[in-house]
Amino acid sequence: MKKPLLLTLLCMILAGCDNPKSLESFTPEMASFSNEFDFDPLRGPVKDFSQTLMSENGEVAKQVTGTLSQEGCFDTLELHDLENNTGLALVLDANYYRDAQTLEKKVQLQGKCQLAALPSAGVTWETDDNGFVVSATGKEMKVEYRYDSEGYPLGKTTINSQNTLSVTAKPSADPRKKLDYTAVSRVNDRQVGNVTQSCEYDAYANPVDCRLVIVDESVKPAVSHHYTIKNRIDYY
């Protein structure tokens, strides 16, 4: 058997010879929603997913679940932050996301299904020419978001009358491992924390299992918190 043919067959058998250039980029909706609602963005034809953050004691700290249309719009999105006893459940209805229980209009949309406004909080979102949310403006604050060429979120800067909080993320140089990243948080240019994450990936280069370490540097000595993230993803 000729070597080129042998290599081709091996690449078909083993998931590891994919050309990184063939990877799908992060959609504007996926990247922007992950920024705003604090979950890891996913690639490809995602149908539904869940991300569960667990403490080192095995307790669920946070869970995010969502369903998406074939066009990449979030049909539903549900978030539960057990550590802070908060939650949110949204369901798509035309140009709004409604509260899944009260049916109150919560989030106004623009374009196909992108964030536009949160009327109750006086927040509006602005997008760039590619449809990514690049800023959020409220009564007393402004947030600016950054992305790389594939749409991966690189962090954000929040500015209010008293402080400037910046989060800067640096993903792995391996394009198939974008969710292996380090991030640094600063308040007024003073570093107050850092985050490191490493993951196992599926054939779509989406994270399956991750290990997350959050270091609080605002206290002395610094305190580290260790988590695991379990992802369940179904595709079209």
From Swiss-Prot:
GO cellular component, one term: plasma membrane
Compartment list: Cell membrane
S-S bonds: none
Key words of the record: Cell membrane, Lipoprotein, Membrane, Palmitate, Signal
Signal sequence interval, chain numbering: 1-16
Organism domain of life: Bacteria
InterPro entries recorded: UPF0257
Lipidation (S-diacylglycerol cysteine): 17
Presence of keyword Plastid: no
Principal cellular location given in the protein's record: membrane
Lipid-bearing positions (N-palmitoyl cysteine): 17
Membrane topology label: Lipid-anchor
Family membership noted in the UniProt record: Belongs to the UPF0257 family.
HAMAP family to which the protein is assigned, alphabetical: UPF0257
Name of the protein: UPF0257 lipoprotein YnfC
Organism: Salmonella dublin (strain CT_02021853)
